[in-house]
Amino acid sequence: MSKKKSPDLFLDNNSDEAEFKGAPGQKISLSGILPGQIIRTMIENGEIWSQGNISEEQIQPASLDLRLSDIAYRIRASFLPSEGSVQEKLTELALHKIDISDGAVLETGCVYLVPLMEALSLPERIKAISNPKSSTGRVDVFTRLICDGSHEFDKVPGGYKGHLWLEISPRTFPVIVRQGTRLNQMRFRRGNTKSSDKELKKLHTEDNIVFNGKADIAEGLAISVNLKAATEESIVGYKAKRHAGLIDLDKPNKYKVAKFWDPVFMNDESRIILDPGEFYILASHESIAVPPSHAAEMVPFNPSIGEFRVH
């Protein structure tokens, strides 16, 4: 869980550790996740820019939704450009180009690279990190952001100036995307944004971040899976069907659950065996409330817990 603060001084001050007076008796640190108010200022300043206007609905409380442009490249393999540019690597790895301006199908088992409409001209002290939107994860579309000179997926260094690209790989369902489809979001950070376990415990005491049980805090907040239900007929999750058909990612609430998902029912042992390579949606046991002063994100992969990704 990360600290989120909101003074305009985020963009101007030279010290991440500086503090400023807010309300009486309150100090405001310049380290943290930048909120929507500051993202708007960055857009006005040209530090975030786009092929077209950035709409208000793209700006979330602590992130910015990013949009696909009109072209997709099917590529032989995913890559990081390291010291070079993404465009240079594309000349070696692109198989063919697809016009997605009016919609196109991205097939399962294939890897695509799409330039994004948004681009950055970041101040030196502002970094960015990208992750899939929750709606993207729920249909098992794997995405990773890259930029020129990047050595890591989903991370943009402070001071970066240039375009952004999104790697897309549908895992379970073939999907329809088009120019303007929003699959991932970007958070902007300054300084140290991670809350310590001590800070998390204090936050739970004050704001009750887990409101239906004990908060298991150790190197972050642990989240468990709920496999208990009221009756044996109760559903505890869903398993995705293979070969179920196309999903248009710009048409939410269009599809019937039964066409794409098989229910997972509770059993006597309150446990299930996950089939390798299959995709499941399971609910957490914990109910979480994130205070307005903070933002939270899940660790996508932790080998000490299991060899699987979570969204």
Model-derived features: where do they sit?
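DUTPase catalytic domain/fold
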Residues: 2-311
